[in-house]
């Protein structure tokens, strides 16, 4: 069984994330979505809220075949990959700036475990501008986030900023 790990903070989960998840499902038998506990980022949503958000929004994708498991983690990404039995880490790229950061991460991860590959999926052109940080800013200022997140995620965002 080919297991892939798609890690992220998912604060909030965006349509860009969902696009990568859907496309990643075609590459692996089981996709583990690693919801990172990143205290440096100071997430808007709690870990529990983010896990529920990912589980809820991925039900329809999983119903089309394949297995999705949501797994919170706080350790090194490469250790998380080992813990869940992943042979590949899947990452989405929106722009050159993403690549520069990810390139460094691949080098470090490869030094820690050369047996785990990293595969990059380019963001769909319609989703390249979507960034969780910007979506939160739009929501905070009362803007319409419906082009960037699902209705349920949008409602959760608006509730946070009321």
From Swiss-Prot:
Gene3D superfamilies: HUPs. Keywords: ATP-binding, Coenzyme A biosynthesis, Cytoplasm, Magnesium, Nucleotide-binding, Nucleotidyltransferase, Transferase. Its EC number is 2.7.7.3. Pathway: Cofactor biosynthesis; coenzyme A biosynthesis; CoA from (R)-pantothenate: step 4/5. The keyword Transmembrane does not apply. GO terms for biological process: coenzyme A biosynthetic process. The record marks 17 as: Transition state stabilizer. One of its GO terms (cellular component) is cytoplasm. Substrate binds at residues 9, 41, 77, 91. Pfam families: CTP_transf_like. It is found in: Cytoplasm. Its cofactor is Mg(2+). One of its GO terms (molecular function) is pantetheine-phosphate adenylyltransferase activity. It catalyses: (R)-4'-phosphopantetheine + ATP + H(+) = 3'-dephospho-CoA + diphosphate. ATP binds at residues 9-10, 17, 92-94, 102, 127-133. Belongs to the bacterial CoaD family. Reversibly transfers an adenylyl group from ATP to 4'-phosphopantetheine, yielding dephospho-CoA (dPCoA) and pyrophosphate. Homohexamer. This is Phosphopantetheine adenylyltransferase. It comes from Cereibacter sphaeroides (strain ATCC 17025 / ATH 2.4.3) (Rhodobacter sphaeroides).
């Amino acid at each position: 069984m080919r297991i892939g790990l798609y890690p992220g903070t998912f604060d909030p989960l965006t349509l860009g994330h969902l696009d990568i998840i859907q496309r990643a499902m075609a590459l692996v038998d089981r996709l583990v979505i690693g919801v990172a506990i990143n205290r440096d980022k100071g997430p808007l949503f709690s870990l529990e809220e983010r896990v529920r958000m990912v589980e809820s929004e991925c039900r329809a994708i999983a119903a089309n075949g394949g297995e999705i498991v949501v797994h919170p983690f706080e350790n090194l990404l490469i250790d998380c990959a080992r813990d869940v039995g992943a042979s590949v880490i899947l990452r989405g790229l929106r722009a050159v700036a993403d690549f520069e950061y990810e390139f460094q991460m691949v080098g470090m991860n490869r030094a820690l475990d050369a047996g785990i590959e990293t595969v990059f999926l380019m963001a769909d052109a319609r989703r390249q501008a979507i960034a969780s940080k910007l979506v939160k800013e739009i929501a905070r200022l009362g803007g319409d986030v419906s082009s960037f997140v699902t209705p349920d995620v949008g409602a959760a965002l608006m509730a946070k900023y009321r």
